[in-house]
Regions:
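Glycine-rich, aromatic-bearing surface loops/beta-hairpins
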Residues: 156-239
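Bacterial N-terminal signal peptides that target proteins for export
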Residues: 1-13
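Sterically constrained small-residue positions within well-ordered secondary structures
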Residues: 29-31, 78
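Structured domain cores in non-transmembrane regions
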Residues: 48-164
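Alpha-helical transmembrane signal-anchor/signal-peptide segments
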Residues: 31-46
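Bacterial N-terminal signal peptides
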Residues: 12-21
Length: 239
């Protein structure tokens, strides 16, 4: 999903020069920023009992004034730092909730909090919602609606990135066996530290894959035999 980064909006020597002269930070020229950490928890029912795993992301969001040239004027841009959720259901069987939205889903992971915590738009502006997320909402847990889900995947062989396959959130049993079902995905604004190192401890090849696709190609192409492995990269797991 295309998004205009905060850096893009601030690009240009003139703006940088003005910021330096004013010395008042980004908000002086109408570039407010908000920062928070959000924890996604994946809960699953299994024959051995309930299982869950979480990951904490750092989120940075900012809006640009309407006077800024370009298509990003007046919009909201966000970026995240952290990693996907990895939930082990059995030896060699791990469910991953990636840093990319599921087909048909929107806003995950960067803008999901704006929609999950303010579904009825009681705070109508992005500025109001950004302020609440940064300063006031802590410990409140909200369930993700289906249209905000991340992409769920697994690997038939954790050492082979080309064995990646999509997991149907409505039918985990088809992938992981009878009695396994997704209970819920929840989001919480937290002060916990950003999750680091867990994904690479499970998928060691992420340390060496670089910027290429999971199937070994350098670019995504419709000619790839394994389209899913050709669509996914390291940034779907770690940012």
């Amino acid at each position: 999903m295309a998004a205009f980064s905060i850096a893009q909006w601030r690009a240009g020597g003139l703006l940088l020069f003005l910021l330096g002269l004013l010395g008042g930070g980004c908000e002086v020229l109408g570039f407010p920023e908000w920062h928070w950490r959000q924890k996604l928890t994946v809960g699953v029912a299994s024959p051995t009992g309930p299982r869950s795993a979480s990951s904490v992301l750092a989120v940075q969001c900012g809006s640009s004034p309407k006077w800024v040239p370009g298509a990003g004027a007046g919009g909201l841009g966000c970026q995240v730092q952290g990693e996907a959720v990895a939930l082990e259901l059995a030896p060699g069987q791990v469910l991953f909730a990636l840093l990319t939205p599921a087909p048909g889903a929107t806003n995950y992971p960067d803008k999901v909090a704006y929609h999950v915590f303010f579904p009825d738009r009681t705070l109508t502006t992005v500025e109001e919602r950004g302020e609440q997320l940064e300063r006031h909402i802590r410990g409140e847990v909200r369930e993700l609606p289906r249209q905000q889900y991340p992409l769920l995947v697994t690997f038939t062989d954790l050492t082979d990135p080309t064995t990646v396959k999509v997991v149907d959130p409505e039918n985990l049993a088809a992938t992981f066996g009878p009695g396994v079902s997704l209970k819920r995905l929840t989001l919480e604004i937290t002060d916990e530290p950003v999750t680091e190192g867990k994904i690479e401890s499970v998928l060691g090849w992420l340390k060496t894959i670089g910027g290429g696709m999971l199937d070994g190609r350098r670019i995504s192409t419709i000619n790839a035999e394994n389209r899913l492995a050709n669509d996914l990269t390291r940034v779907d797991f770690i940012r």
